[in-house]
């Protein structure tokens, strides 16, 4: 009550922010007459003037009024478009490390030119981030004339571009590209073998378009660069034959062992669990197929990989549906983005799931991959010094933006009042009744010339509605992953009188739906149009535009509620742009996924009490409230998952930053000999300590073991036993110094043969290659640890704390292994001539190039551990202190490599 009263008196935080910014807008407006008087050359010269002022120490924020006034005036001259006051407000919000919520059609692309210009003045680069390549290219080309008029350079960063072109794009003042490409370039730069191979500059300012889609919807899916792992495609095929024999059971009853089902599905968490009966049948079938020996258990340690195959195959059959989660095109399984409905060419599910789906669909199974580098969008975008974003729907996720990214959300008012009518939801008992009602509504709307946009949540649903419309004889366009190339053209004409467009989720975001259709698209279709033709097209469009407005504007039909209210609002937001008329309505059924999983019992009870008949719809505040509560429940659960993922990924992120920082230092120096000398001392001290414990009696020394270790691991054939026989007075410390001196002497002799410069080059290459190899193995082990860490909860331990503790131990052990392997490799390498060192270096380069060609870029679902299979194959089991050391010395681990821990 008190908060409401205070808000009424002083205004909300949003109101206070806008009030403060409106004062600056008044200053910008007052500068307009002065700017209009400037010649083109004088206006262009302002950029150089601003840069000089910044160099002299002026603060960027002080330039806002004048810089924004310059951009507005330049836009009037170049585009004939003047920034509205609300766009100036949006520009200021974006400069203040905030999220600007601006409704569809309010000109977000033009708004972005203001903060992009201002922050580009620093010379550190601005990254404008879009959701797909088409929008990146379109926005860059559209805004290029404005920025170039003002003396700034513009770059486009697209997938598949050669490194020199990418480097040029990043060197530009303002770079346009997709979130995926920026992230992958960051990972690739941190796998480079020379500073010249890197393409990015320091990450300065990121301006993210459709920020909710990138920072929230895609936050759970890390970017992964992977290389090929061991081939196990045959096993996927063999296990796939077994799965159709299993029957789904709604609930597992392991105690009474009743029911015919073999597995249960938890749709909320998207997990599949074998029942007791299912486990027995699976084991019988595996024995029958000759995959497993009789009497063996599927859960025995020896069958851990087999269990992985069974789980992947079960998930592929029970949870993943063709034309919903993926499509099959040209003999390839292509993932469909659940948020946008677009296909994600080249991306693959992790943990063997993609191979299992390929086996299910009978297409060629591609090899599993091993993670080489990985980062989540949450952690990538937090690397920027300054981050801001814009979207039409951010307010519902304001808490998440604030708690995870430290970004406040500011709702920017519309230029004209919003008059769209959002009609109450209609709920039917069955999907068939719902679809029929949608068809009737479309018939009524199109009969009076009103355009209709139908939003569906999957390709399967869009094709179902399309088939029904075809049966009813209604002409329509389908916009889903299968018709990707025509996306922008179809969306542009969706406002044509009586046009019916079916869009999967929010395919086509970023392209405005103009009432009456797009006259620009009609002009673009003509070859060398005359002024008369253009005028006629414009006049025809005006007639159509007025007719659509009279019919009620664009009508939006939602065929289902999405898990998130924000996605529903995005669909509604396609109508009612810039004060246009419009309407929207959602049609639901008790068979919809959201209703079935989260709201079914309560709402079904209400509907029965209200005595519903077939074909009847319910329209009641109770039902709407129950649906909103179901959505809040899902949103809250998804937020918790993302927050938990971030807490776990932060552990890996600290390690990633340490490794990448060390790697970049290595790349930037030409001489690492001091580092090599320092770690050689550490390695030899630790190695000698394992056989000659400090301050110990001579009887405790293991001289034969030490000699063997030095010979095997460092190619040092030293007669230590002879030294001790000839010099009984040889002290432990003197012996250590002599061994180290001998190793340095042998190494220096190699250096004399090949030359100091060549040796420095080789040392650097060995350090980089060893670091990359161990980091790759560490990532696999971390994924494997993450997969099973939740089980620690059963031992009354906090899984997060256990994960932090164990991953730190693994990281420390990896750094020790790095030292040991670098010195071992450098000691063992045999070189006689400079040409041989050059040849070794050439081999290393060729191997790096081969791996680069085999790398796959994937944006993978983090619900499964990305490299569990690999870790099971390559991750070493934990060695007990009293176990024999894995190095083969024959000593106990605690007296050998255990001392390095």
Swiss-Prot record:
Gene Ontology molecular function, alphabetical: ATP binding; metal ion binding; protein-exporting ATPase activity
Source organism superkingdom: Bacteria
Tagged with keyword Membrane: yes
PROSITE patterns: SECA, SECA_MOTOR_DEAD
UniProt keyword terms in alphabetical order: ATP-binding, Cell inner membrane, Cell membrane, Cytoplasm, Membrane, Metal-binding, Nucleotide-binding, Protein transport, Translocase, Translocation, Transport, Zinc
Named cofactor requirement(s): Zn(2+)
Record: residues binding ATP: 87, 105-109, 512
Induction pattern: Repressed under conditions of excess protein secretion capacity and derepressed when protein secretion becomes limiting. This is regulated by SecM.
GO cellular component, one term: cytosol
One of the GO BP terms on file: intracellular protein transmembrane transport
Cofactor binding note of this UniProt entry: May bind 1 zinc ion per subunit.
HAMAP family: SecA
Complex and partners: Monomer and homodimer. Part of the essential Sec protein translocation apparatus which comprises SecA, SecYEG and auxiliary proteins SecDF-YajC and YidC.
Family indicated by similarity: Belongs to the SecA family.
UniProt name for this protein: Protein translocase subunit SecA
Species of the source: Escherichia coli O6:K15:H31 (strain 536 / UPEC)
């Amino acid at each position: 009550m008190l908060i409401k009263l205070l808000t009424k008196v002083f205004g909300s935080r949003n109101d206070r922010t806008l009030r403060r910014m409106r004062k600056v807008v008044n200053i910008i407006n007052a500068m307009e007459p002065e700017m209009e008087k400037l010649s083109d050359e004088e206006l262009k010269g302002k950029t150089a003037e601003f840069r000089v002022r910044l160099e002299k120490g002026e603060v960027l924020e002080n330039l806002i009024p004048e810089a924004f006034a310059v951009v507005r005036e330049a836009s009037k001259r170049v585009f004939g478009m003047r920034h509205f006051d609300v766009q100036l407000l949006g520009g200021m919000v974006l400069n203040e490390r905030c999220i600007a919520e601006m409704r569809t059609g309010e000109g977000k692309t033009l708004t972005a030119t203001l903060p992009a210009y201002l922050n580009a003045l620093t010379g550190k680069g601005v990254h404008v981030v879009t959701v797909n390549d088409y929008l990146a290219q379109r926005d860059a080309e559209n805004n290029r004339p404005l920025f170039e008029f003002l003396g700034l350079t513009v770059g486009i960063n697209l997938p598949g571009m050669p490194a020199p072109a990418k480097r040029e794009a990043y060197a530009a003042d303002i770079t346009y590209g997709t979130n995926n490409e920026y992230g992958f370039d960051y990972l690739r730069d941190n796998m480079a073998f020379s500073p010249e191979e890197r393409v990015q500059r320091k990450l300065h300012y990121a301006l993210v378009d459709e920020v909710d889609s990138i920072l929230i919807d895609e936050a759970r899916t890390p970017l992964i660069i992977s290389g090929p792992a061991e081939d196990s495609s045959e096993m996927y095929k063999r296990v796939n034959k077994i799965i159709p024999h299993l029957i789904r059971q709604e609930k597992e009853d392991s105690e009474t062992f009743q029911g015919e089902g073999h597995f249960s599905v938890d749709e909320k968490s998207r997990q599949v669990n074998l029942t007791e009966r299912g486990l027995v049948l699976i084991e019988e079938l595996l024995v029958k197929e000759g995959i497993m020996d009789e009497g063996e258990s599927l859960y025995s340690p020896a069958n851990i990989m087999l269990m992985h195959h069974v789980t992947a195959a079960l998930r592929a059959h029970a949870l993943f549906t063709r034309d919903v989660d993926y499509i099959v095109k040209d003999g390839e399984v292509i993932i469909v983005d659940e948020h946008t409905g677009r296909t994600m060419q080249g991306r693959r599910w992790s943990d063997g799931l993609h191979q299992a789906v390929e086996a299910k669909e009978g297409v060629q199974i591609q090899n599993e991959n091993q993670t080489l580098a990985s980062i989540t969008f949450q952690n990538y975008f937090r690397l920027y010094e300054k981050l801001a974003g814009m979207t039409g729907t951010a307010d519902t996720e304001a808490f998440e933006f604030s708690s995870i990214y430290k970004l406040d959300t500011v709702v920017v008012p519309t230029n004209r009042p919003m008059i769209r009518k959002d009609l109450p939801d209609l709920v039917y008992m069955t999907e068939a009744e719902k679809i029929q009602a949608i068809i009737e509504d479309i018939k009524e709307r199109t009969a009076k010339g009103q355009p209709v946009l139908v939003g569906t949540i999957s390709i399967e649903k869009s094709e179902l509605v399309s088939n029904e419309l075809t049966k009813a004889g209604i002409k329509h366009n389908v916009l889903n992953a299968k018709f990707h190339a025509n996306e922008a053209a179809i969306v542009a004409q969706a406002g044509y009188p009586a046009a019916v467009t079916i869009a999967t989720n929010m395919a086509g975001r970023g392209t405005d739906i103009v009432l009456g259709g797009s006259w620009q698209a009609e002009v673009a279709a003509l070859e060398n149009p005359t002024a008369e033709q253009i005028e006629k097209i414009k006049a025809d469009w005006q007639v159509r535009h007025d007719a659509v407005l009279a019919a009620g504007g664009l009508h939006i039909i939602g065929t289902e509620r999405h898990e998130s209210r924000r996605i529903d609002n995005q669909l509604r937001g396609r109508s009612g742009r810039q004060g246009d008329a419009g309407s929207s309505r959602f049609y639901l059924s008790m068979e919809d996924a959201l209703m079935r999983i989260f709201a079914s019992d309560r709402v079904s009870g209400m509907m029965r009490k209200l005595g519903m008949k077939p074909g009847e719809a319910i329209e009641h505040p109770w039902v709407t409230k129950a649906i909103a509560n179901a959505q809040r429940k899902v949103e809250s659960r998804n937020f918790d998952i993302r927050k938990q993922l971030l807490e776990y990924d932060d552990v890996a992120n600290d390690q990633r930053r340490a490794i990448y920082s060390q790697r970049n230092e290595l790349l930037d120096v030409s001489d690492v000999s001091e580092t090599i000398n320092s770690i050689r001392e550490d390695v030899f001290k630790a190695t000698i300590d394992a056989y000659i414990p400090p301050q110990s009696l001579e009887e405790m020394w293991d001289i034969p073991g030490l000699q063997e270790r030095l010979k095997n691991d460092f190619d040092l054939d030293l007669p230590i036993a002879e030294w001790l026989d000839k010099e009984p007075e040889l002290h432990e410390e003197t012996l250590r110094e002599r061994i180290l001196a001998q190793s340095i002497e042998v190494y220096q002799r190699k250096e004399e043969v090949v030359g100091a410069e060549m040796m420095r080059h080789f040392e650097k290459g060995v350090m980089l290659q060893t670091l990359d190899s161990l980091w790759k193995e560490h990532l696999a082990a971390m994924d494997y640890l993450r997969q099973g860490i939740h089980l620690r909860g059963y031992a009354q331990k906090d899984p997060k704390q256990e994960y932090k503790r164990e991953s730190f131990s693994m990281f420390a052990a990896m750094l020790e292994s790095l030292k040991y392997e670098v010195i071992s490799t450098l000691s063992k390498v045999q070189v006689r001539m400079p040409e041989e060192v050059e040849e070794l270096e050439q081999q290393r380069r060729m191997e790096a190039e081969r791996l680069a060609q085999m790398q796959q870029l994937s944006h993978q679902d983090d619900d499964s551990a990305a490299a569990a299979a690999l870790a099971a194959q390559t991750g070493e089991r934990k060695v007990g202190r009293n176990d024999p050391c894995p190095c083969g010395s024959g000593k106990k681990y605690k007296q050998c490599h255990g001392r390095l821990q």
